[in-house]
Amino acid sequence: MAINLQTLFKKKREGKKITMVSTYDYWSAKLCDEVGIDCILVGDSLGTVVKGEGDTLSVTLEEIIYHTKCVMRGVKNAFVIADMPFMSYQVSMEKAVENCGRVIKETKAKAVKLEGGEEIAELVYKLTRIGIPVVGHVGFTPQHINVFGKPKVVGKKKEEEEKLRRDFRALEEAGAFMIVLESVPTHLAKELWKGSNSIVIGIGAGKYVDGQVLVFHDIVGLFEDFKPKFVRRYLEGAKLVKEALKNFKIDVEGGNFPSEEESYG
C-alpha cells in the first residue's frame, strides 16, 4: 500500500520507527521499495556519492529532477522526498516557490527537503500553505559546509544548542511535517523529539527519534571514500563487486567467457 503523510504520522503515534534511505536511481529505489522502506530521499548527497565531488554544492536542480524521476520509476509504495539543492531556494521567495513547485510537478515526488532553520521558516510556511509538504533539515547541514569548515557535531556548545532549538521550533511552527536532525548529540535530539508534533528523523542523532535515514551506498558498502561514525554497513558491497569484476576479467582474458552455453549457434 502506498505510504502517505497519514501513514507516517500513524507510525509516529504508535511508536513505530520510520525507515528512510537516500538513493538516486531506479534499481536501488526499487530494491528499497520491495523490502518496505518507508521513505526514499533523493538527496543532494548524490554530489559526493554519485558525482564524486567533495561536497554537495555543485548539484543542480536539473540533476535532482533527473534522479528523482529515475527513483519514481522504481517505486510503488515508498514516500519519495526530493532534496532542494544549494541556491535553488535561497535567492528569493518567488524563485524558491517556483523551483519547489517545478520539482513536485515534474517528478511527482511527495515532498521537498530544505536545509536551514529560522532563515527559511517563511518559505516553509508558504510552501505548506500552497500544498507542498516540506521536510526540514537542521544540525549539520552539508550545504553550509563552507561555514562549518568540515562535517561536525552541532549542539555541543551552548550557543549552538540554543540556535538548534530556535531553528527546530521555527521549522515546526512553520509547518514542516518532518525534520531531519543530522550530527546532533543524543540528549538534545531526544529533547527536541519529545516535545515535537513533527516527525523527527535522525542521522547521527541517536535513537530517541521517530526514525533513521542513511545513504544506500553506505548501507550496502559501495561508498568507500569515507565512513562517518553514524554509518552502519550491512554489506561489504564494494568488495563483492570488485571480486565479480576481477573474475570477469580473468575469464575473458583466459578465454573462458563466453562458453558454448552463453553463445548463439
UniProtKB/Swiss-Prot annotation:
Is RNA-binding there in the keyword field?
A: no
Instruction: Enumerate the active-site residues.
Output: E182
> Cofactors per UniProt?
Mg(2+)
Q: Which CDD domains match?
A: KPHMT-like
One biological-process term from Gene Ontology?
Answer: pantothenate biosynthetic process
The metabolic or biological pathway listed in the UniProt record of this protein is: Cofactor biosynthesis; (R)-pantothenate biosynthesis; (R)-pantoate from 3-methyl-2-oxobutanoate: step 1/2
Q: Which residues bind 3-methyl-2-oxobutanoate?
A: D44, S45, D83, K113
EC class of the enzyme, as a word = transferase
Q: Where in the cell is it found?
A: Cytoplasm
> Which Pfam families does the UniProt entry name for this protein?
Pantoate_transf
User: What are the GO MF terms of this UniProt record?
Assistant: 3-methyl-2-oxobutanoate hydroxymethyltransferase activity; magnesium ion binding
Catalytic activity annotation: 3-methyl-2-oxobutanoate + (6R)-5,10-methylene-5,6,7,8-tetrahydrofolate + H2O = 2-dehydropantoate + (6S)-5,6,7,8-tetrahydrofolate
Q: List residues traversing the bilayer.
A: none
Co-factor remark? Binds 1 Mg(2+) ion per subunit.
Q: Which residues bind Mg(2+)?
A: D44, D83, E115
Q: Which UniProt keywords apply?
A: Cytoplasm, Magnesium, Metal-binding, Pantothenate biosynthesis, Transferase
What's this protein's function? Catalyzes the reversible reaction in which hydroxymethyl group from 5,10-methylenetetrahydrofolate is transferred onto alpha-ketoisovalerate to form ketopantoate.
Which NCBIfam families does this entry report, sorted A to Z? panB, PRK00311.1
On assembly, the entry states:
Homodecamer; pentamer of dimers.
Protein known as: 3-methyl-2-oxobutanoate hydroxymethyltransferase
UniProt source species: Aquifex aeolicus (strain VF5)
